[in-house]
Swiss-Prot record:
It is an enzyme of class 2 (transferase). PANTHER family: NICOTINATE-NUCLEOTIDE--DIMETHYLBENZIMIDAZOLE PHOSPHORIBOSYLTRANSFERASE (PTHR43463:SF1). Keywords: Cobalamin biosynthesis, Glycosyltransferase, Transferase. The gene is cobT. It comes from the Bacteria. It holds the Pfam family DBI_PRT. The keyword Ubl conjugation does not apply. SUPFAM superfamilies: Nicotinate mononucleotide:5,6-dimethylbenzimidazole phosphoribosyltransferase (CobT). The keyword Glycosyltransferase applies. Pathway: Nucleoside biosynthesis; alpha-ribazole biosynthesis; alpha-ribazole from 5,6-dimethylbenzimidazole: step 1/2. The active site is at E327 (proton acceptor). GO terms for molecular function: nicotinate-nucleotide-dimethylbenzimidazole phosphoribosyltransferase activity. This is Nicotinate-nucleotide--dimethylbenzimidazole phosphoribosyltransferase. It catalyses: 5,6-dimethylbenzimidazole + nicotinate beta-D-ribonucleotide = alpha-ribazole 5'-phosphate + nicotinate + H(+).
Length: 360
């Protein structure tokens, strides 16, 4: 049975109340703009939550909320990894998924610190982890095809992944969650992300490919060559964002893309992590441009090409820490800043409240 096409209906955020929202921000006890990027972030969050059909208050009375923040880490293996494009073999994907389940990875530590609930989704690692609680089975296969030799997956598999991702997001939405963050694990997935970037942005491969988690120059040359071969092989088939995912993507990238679209459809805030998650966001924006209104970009990673992709998406990340780990670590570290934006909007006194002469 073929998988029916999955579509998303995403409303743009309403900007009709921007003057009132901005006025509330400007009348806090500070010079205008003194909280920098936190102010533009508060405006974005207020727009999203004002767009929610359940929100009826005027901006001056609105209380912004972050409810049940959830980190979703999607894992999948890549056929191209067999060619040695990473510092680690594919087996490490499975080992790290086990590490996530046991609470021992960086993402576990950071989620515990900042208050994220963490879920790990097996989208298609080579060998499933059995007998370990805390891993959600949304497998689309046992690793993708090697993209320099064949498509990563069938087009129908992309839609199947989107449907699974929508169901996952719906479960969290029904539980009251209004902010989801996205991380990933998959040896070889920087190759897939770079190929997606090159295809969508029409760039030379050398402008998109980096050292991932730390490959040497010889491995980098091999990685460049294989991605160039992949783009040449699939050139005629790259007719739209879904075909880009089918030819060049990963099971985890597909489900991240679908989950971003589904979360925006439900008017949830979406926190995007690093290079691979941003590649998923790049595809999501091609599918439904309105999704961009809901995306918060956590950080600029140390991966070659990430800055260029962020600029293409007109995104200003919250952090720049030289991270190149993935897992959602940058997105986790951004949560306190997001909460700070919400808190100053809700709790900071206005000039009139404090009896201070306005400096607006």
């Amino acid at each position: 049975m073929s998988q029916s096409a999955v579509s998303f209906q995403i409303s743009p955020v309403s900007k009709t109340q921007d003057p009132l929202i901005q006025q509330k921000i400007d009348l806090k006890t500070k010079p205008p703009g003194a909280l920098g990027q936190l102010e533009s972030l508060a405006l974005q969050i207020a727009r999203v939550q004002a767009t929610d059909s359940q929100q009826t208050d005027q901006p001056q009375n609105t209380v912004l909320k972050i409810v049940h923040p959830t980190m979703l880490v999607f894992a999948g293996d890549h056929g191209i990894a067999a060619e040695g494009v990473s510092i680690a073999p594919s087996e490490v994907t499975r080992q790290m998924v086990q590490n996530f389940a046991h609470g021992g990875a960086a993402i576990n530590v950071f989620c515990r610190q900042v208050g994220f609930t963490l879920e790990v989704i097996d989208c298609g690692i080579l060998t499933p982890v059995e007998g370990v609680e805390g891993i959600i089975d949304q497998r689309l296969g046992a690793g993708t095809g090697a993209i320099h030799l064949e498509p990563a997956m069938a087009l129908e598999t992309v839609d199947k992944g989107f449907a699974m991702a929508r169901d996952l997001i719906e479960r969290h939405h029904q539980a009251g969650c209004n902010l989801v963050a996205f991380g990933e694990m998959g040896i070889g997935n920087t190759s897939a992300a770079a190929a997606i970037m090159a295809a969508i942005m029409q760039l030379d491969v050398i402008d998109c490919v980096g050292r991932g988690t730390g490959i040497n120059s010889e491995t980098l040359e091999r990685k460049l060559m294989l991605i160039e071969l992949a783009l040449l092989l699939h050139q005629s088939a790259l007719t739209g964002p879904k075909s880009v995912l089918a030819c060049l993507g990963g099971f985890e990238i597909v489900q991240m893309t679908g989950a971003m679209l589904a979360a925006a459809e439900r008017k949830m805030l979406v926190v995007v992590d690093g290079f691979i998650a941003t590649a998923a966001a790049l595809v999501a924006v091609q599918i439904a441009p309105n999704v961009r209104d809901y995306l918060i970009f956590a950080h600029q990673s140390d991966e070659q090409g990430h800055q260029r992709m962020l600029e293409f998406l007109q995104a200003k990340p919250l952090l720049s820490l030289g991270l190149r780990l993935g897992e959602g670590t940058g997105a986790a570290l951004a949560l306190p800043l997001i909460q700070a934006s919400v808190n100053f909007y809700n709790q900071m006194a206005s000039f009139s409240d404090a009896g201070i002469e306005a400096v607006v």
